[in-house]
Each structure stands twice: as C-alpha cells, then as structure tokens.
Amino acid sequence: MKYAIISDIHGNLPALELAIADAQANGADAFLLAGDYCTSAPWGSAVVDKLRALPNALHVRGNEEDYLHLPQGDDGQFQVTYWSSRQLRADQLAWLDELPHQVEFECEGVCVHMAHSSQAFIGNAAYERRPSRLAQLYPTGCVTREAFLADTRRTLDESPVFHEKLLTLPKGVYIFGHSHNQWHARFGDHLFINPGSCGINLDCAEFAAVYTLLSIENGECTVEERRIPYDAEALIAEVKQTEQYHAARVWTEIIFDEWRTCRDQIYFFLRHTEAFAQSIGDERRPFSVDTWEKSYEQWKNASLF
C-alpha cells in the first residue's frame, strides 16, 4: 500500500495539483492529509473541493481551520483570514469542522497515527526545527536534504523530551505537519514523518510542491520524499490578479517573500510590527489596518538596504 502524505496546503491549489498528479503517477493508492488547507494563498475553496473528491483519503484538521471561525473584524492582522473564510461555502466550512484532530489506522500490521502537529506525539522536542529558527540556522542558499535530515535527527537525539516521549509511544508510524519543513526519521520501532508544506515550503531549499510517499508492504515501511519544483514568480503573478491581493495585500506580500526565499518571514514581520506598534504607542491588538500597513512599508524599505 502506498500513501501520499500532504500537509499545509494553505490555499495553494497549483501546488496541490502538482503533488496529486505526481503521487498518482508514482502509484499512490491513498492519501493522508495533515491539516491547514486554506489561508495564505487565494484558492482555499477549490482546495477543499479537490480534497473532498480525493479517493481513499483520510484528513485531520489543522490550526488554520480553527481561525476560519474568527468573527469578521476591521483589523489589518487577520484580513487574509477574514477574506479566506468568506470564500468558503457553508458545506465546505461544515466539512472542515467535522474533521478530527487525530486519526489512527492499521495497514499490514503497522499502526499509523496522524495529527497536524508533532506536539501530539513528541511534545516540543522538534521546537528547535521551527521555521523561524531554521531561517536563522540557514540564512542563505539551499540546504541539501542530507544536511537537513542529519541536523533534524541530531536535534531529536539531543532532546531529553524526545527520548521521554519515545518511551511512552507505541511502535508505529507517526505523521504530522505544521512546521513547514520536510523530514523523516526512524528510531527503533518508531517512524516519524513530516511531509513538509505543500503550499509554503520553509525548509531553506528550492521552491517546490512538497509531499512524502509512504509505502507499507509485508509490515515494512519505506519513505520517499517528493519535491516538485515550479515557478514562484509565475505563481506570484497569478495571485496578484486575485481579490485576495487587494483585500489582504500586506499578508500576501509577506507570503510572496516566503515563496521567494523558502524561509519564514511572517514570524519576523510580526515581531517587527509589535515593536513598531509600541514605538508609536498603539496598544490595539490585533493590529489596526493603519499600523499593519505602515509597519509593512517600514519593513519593506528596511529590506532594500
């Protein structure tokens, strides 16, 4: 049995279509979807329809699915969330609401567990591999897969929390996303798989539609990481023609920077905006439209030098 594992699509329909086509061309029998399907790219509604139509698929919900129910506000910070939720039909929202936070099943004697975040299984053991930290560890260039996987394994090896959690976990496969970086590691009878982010890969490598294939045969598991390069600038040009770009320009521009660099930008922009708001005595949170946009102009101008 071969599973295509896809996570963190974030409304990026072109990336999802590339991943699905590649998975089917490589003989995928079923799909495992690990959450965060909408918001950040403008095609969340089409993404949901595509996911609902997938044959032999299991889905869990991510943290972004919770934000879709935020009351519509007049702030700048959540403009993209408000816009994204308005694009979804009632039946799509209901489908997302019904998704479980965690699933498990057995295949050929192997127990497979899936949740959106690794915290469901190993606590904060992988926290040092969060996107903002990766951007600091690998500030420029493309990190090789060999180096990235070795660094990830070293982080887990050196984590007391990880080894404590490992003692409590039943043997099997553990699948999760959320951190937007693709990796897998085997520790004895435990196999951990993060398929990365299909829609916004932040693992300091090439821009690509990212997902992972898991094959289970006669109780044995093999993993193949898949990365399908495509044109970031062409995608950006397409997004600029959508309503989202005008409704949530600042957030969308930051996503463009993430696509161009394959590194976290949102975290650093939010830190910048917090400092900017404090400097002008603005205590409103979420940030107002005026503060949000002025902070972005300052951020953009600073990045030019």
Predicted regions and their residues:
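Beta-strand-turn-beta hairpins that frame and shape the catalytic cleft
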Residues: 1-4, 104-113, 187-192, 221-222
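N-terminal active-site segment of His-dependent metallophosphoesterases
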Residues: 1-54
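Active-site neighborhood of phospho(di)ester-bond hydrolases with catalytic His/Asp-centered motifs
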Residues: 6-7, 31-36, 40, 58-63, ...
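Active-site environment of divalent metal-dependent phosphoester hydrolases
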Residues: 10-14, 39-42, 64-69, 120-122, ...
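Glycine-rich phosphate-binding loop signature in dinucleotide/nucleotide-binding domains
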Residues: 23-27, 107, 167-170, 213, ...
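Active-site neighborhood of divalent metal-dependent phosphoester bond hydrolases
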Residues: 47, 54-105, 109-114, 121, ...
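A contiguous binding-surface segment within folded domains or other stable secondary-structure elements
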Residues: 132-139, 145-215
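Acidic, His/Gly-rich catalytic cores of divalent-metal-dependent hydrolytic chemistry
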Residues: 186-305
